[in-house]
A protein has these predicted regions:
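Short, well-ordered beta-strand segments
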Residues: 1, 51, 81, 98-102, ...
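Short beta-strand-to-loop elements that line the ligand-binding cleft
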Residues: 26-35, 101, 120-130
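Acidic, polar ligand-binding/catalytic clefts
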Residues: 6, 16, 20, 24, ...
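Short, hydrophobic alpha-helical packing/hinge segments within bilobed ligand-binding/sensory domains
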Residues: 14-15, 38-43, 133-136, 142, ...
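Conserved functional loop/turn residues at catalytic and ligand-binding sites
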Residues: 47, 98, 141
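Short loop->beta-strand "edge-of-pocket" segments that line small-molecule binding or catalytic clefts
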Residues: 1, 8, 92-108
């Protein structure tokens, strides 16, 4: 929100554009905060009309949920954030590490796939959403926080000392 409490940013502006086009008034927007698992169900149940958030497009979500995805709006990849003090330079050095992840997310599935493919162990510590996972990482509950790379950069700025965290080069 801005100083007056009005929501700002890409997602809310997209909502306002849809409201203007469909309802003739950009201010006829009612927002509801939800996490990934509840938002898809709410859309399918007709509790909300659209979801605007940086959800990862996957083929199974596109064809298996009965929902219509728009075009991809941001092209990104999964990233990994670690504390500089670990001295880690690559994802390949994270065998046995603990990861703070959002439960049920593509981030969780991708991490599991990567470590299984590379015959490496890791421990997944899951949370209800990305914000909770980031807060747990910042509090020292995990070695690694993972989400989309552009999200990592933004989230890192909210940490106690952003300069103490580094985004690994792998995507």
């Amino acid at each position: 929100p801005d100083a007056s409490g009005k929501l700002v940013g890409f997602d809310i502006e997209l909502c306002r554009a849809v409201a203007a086009a469909v309802l003739g008034d950009a201010d006829k927007v009612k927002t509801t905060k939800m996490n990934l698992p509840t938002s898809f169900g709410a859309l399918q149940a007709g509790e909300v009309d659209i979801i605007t958030h940086r959800f990862t497009w996957t083929f199974s979500r596109d064809v298996g949920t009965g929902m219509n995805y728009t075009r991809v709006m941001v092209w990104d990849g999964q990233g990994f954030l670690v504390r500089k003090s670990l001295g880690v330079k690559s994802l390949t050095e994270l065998g046995g590490a603990t990861f703070c992840l959002a439960s049920g997310s593509t981030t969780e599935a991708n991490a599991a796939d990567y470590f299984r493919t590379h015959n490496m162990d890791f421990k997944s510590v899951t949370f209800s959403d990305m914000k909770a996972a980031a807060q747990a990482y910042n509090a020292g509950r995990c070695d690694v926080y993972s989400t989309d790379k552009f999200g990592l950069g933004a989230r890192r700025l909210t940490f106690d000392d952003p300069s103490e965290h580094v985004i690994l080069p792998e995507v």
